[in-house]
Amino acid sequence: MGFRPTALRLATELGITGTVCNTGGRVTLTATGEGAALTAFEKRLCRAFSIYQYEENELPFQPFSGFTITHSRGARGLPFLPPDLATCPDCQRELLDPKNRRYRHPFITCIHCGPRYTVMEALPYDRERTVMGRFPLCPDCRAEYTTPADRRCHAQTIACPHCGPQLTMDIETAAQLLRQGEVVAVKGIGGYHLCASAANPPAVAKIRQIKHRGQKPFAVLFRNIEEVRQYCRVSQAEEKLLLSAARPIVLLHSKRPLPTEITCGSDRVGAFLPCNPLQILLLEAISPLVVTSANISGAPMCTDDTAVQQFGVPVLGHDRPILTPIDDSVLQVTEGNPAFMRRARGYVPLAVEPVSYTHLTLPTK
């Protein structure tokens, strides 16, 4: 993510002139400069991003006064839609830094993280075509958005406590309710979750009753990878998935018993880590939590701020709309390789990568 500001920064560094713009889910880049600089520019861009496909063409010389990000335009062809990405390490550090202006701001993002797919209204992917267009940038955020060297340059979902979305309940209030054994509905990236303390079996049983859910284990949200290791055995491959920008639920072998109300007697646990700032802040206050989609089993995940009231539990919500519902992804590692049990948040709407296979010739009768 953040291809255009990264291209701008590299071009400025290498003395390259030209333009870069969104074209309906793709990027068109025109660059002019010395041969060695252009080669370095291309290599560094390719190293910085997972580029699925690109075409390179030599054009007649055009003089440019500098390198600029130009206005997005539509284009034909199959577009590239960006997935939602978990809070990056830089944003998490700022979130927990009392000296930072975004300290404890539950909607902190940058070019490397935050909601994309779930907040997009249309392509090309620009702020005015996301739900964040409803939140005009304050002068400080506008300065970051327009500064090439800033990691929030052209980051479409940025905001701050002064100009961004607002919570409907204080996080500490929600944490206190959870400590008291309450079930709380929490608005996530792709929908609402029903949450309860993993240390409170009656609260977990209440979630099962609300959802009309039979003997099917619940996933557990842990504060960090160290806490996951207290309860589960974690291989290198599993840890890589847990810490990835997709933040999926990963099926792990347990090593410390969890209540049967969570596991239903299984020796495996669906574990995952916080994928957004609101979860990070909540887990700082109480952890681990049972976290499951707010729905009646078999029904779609709830995204509506009014419909969530049907569950009859306190609600920790906010005024940033969810346009596209999406559930948490679920994977397990089999023989060292990740296998999807549910491909969703963090991976959708990316194309499924090709899998190698062998053609078998079946004998004829």
Task: Label every PLM stretch briefly.
Residues 58, 183, 191-254, 324:
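A phosphate-binding glycine/aspartate-rich beta-alpha loop in the early core of alpha/beta enzymes
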Residues 240-299:
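Divalent-metal (Mg2+/Mn2+/Ca2+)-assisted nucleotide/phosphate chemistry catalytic cores
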Residues 20, 184-187, 194, 220-222, ...:
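General beta-strand structural signal in soluble alpha/beta enzymes
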Residues 285-357:
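Internal gly/pro-rich beta-alpha loop/helix module
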Residues 358-364:
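Conserved small/polar residues in nucleotide/adenosyl-binding loops
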